[in-house]
């Protein structure tokens, strides 16, 4: 089912949103001051291309023992910079694509996936794209650690 939905996403606009993310990734590589944003751009590019079966999860959830104060502070600064220069137009791109996809009954699941990516597009630094199973296992392990 994931494969069918990913193909449907690609055909109904996922290709265009992925190109938008690739453009943002290339811009972040070319401009030296945006180089720290490249990893986040690439992670969300993968999610935009294949949204079903993958999930964007914060790195603190993947490795709670290795919490990095620099990532939290620096990540917030980078996210604010990202939001001002890149995030808003990528978010609008996903919202517009999601609305267009929700016009037809077949496109509704894909449109909902675009709305989820739109939220991530605003604040992507510190997120990694992993399989749904890995994200669920990380959340369960964190919950066990909290209650031990």
Curated annotation (Swiss-Prot):
One Pfam assignment: YccF
Topology, Periplasmic side: 1-14, 100-102
Coiled coil stretches, renumbered: none
Main location: membrane
One GO CC term on file: plasma membrane
Topological relation to the membrane, as annotated: Multi-pass membrane protein
Keyword Transmembrane: yes
Source superkingdom: Bacteria
Keywords for the protein's UniProt record, in alphabetical order: Cell inner membrane, Cell membrane, Membrane, Transmembrane, Transmembrane helix
Residue intervals annotated with topology Cytoplasmic: 38-76, 126-148
Location in or out of the cell: Cell inner membrane
Transmembrane spans: 15-37, 77-99, 103-125
Keyword Lipid biosynthesis: no
Record-linked PANTHER family: INNER MEMBRANE PROTEIN YCCF
Protein's name in the database: Inner membrane protein YccF
UniProt source species: Escherichia coli (strain K12)
């Amino acid at each position: 089912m994931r494969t069918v939905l990913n193909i449907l996403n690609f055909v109904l606009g996922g290709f265009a949103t992925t190109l938008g993310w690739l453009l943002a990734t290339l811009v972040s590589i070319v401009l030296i001051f945006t180089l720290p944003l490249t990893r986040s751009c690439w992670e969300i590019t993968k999610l935009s291309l294949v949204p079903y079966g993958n999930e964007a999860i914060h790195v603190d959830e993947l490795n709670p023992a290795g919490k990095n104060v620099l990532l939290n502070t620096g990540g917030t600064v980078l996210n604010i910079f990202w939001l001002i220069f890149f995030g808003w137009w990528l978010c609008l791109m996903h919202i517009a694509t999601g609305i267009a996809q929700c016009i037809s009954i077949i496109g509704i699941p894909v449109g909902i996936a675009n709305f989820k990516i739109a939220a991530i597009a605003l604040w992507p630094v510190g997120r990694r794209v992993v399989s749904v199973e890995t994200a669920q296992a990380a959340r369960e392990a964190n919950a066990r650690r909290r209650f031990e």
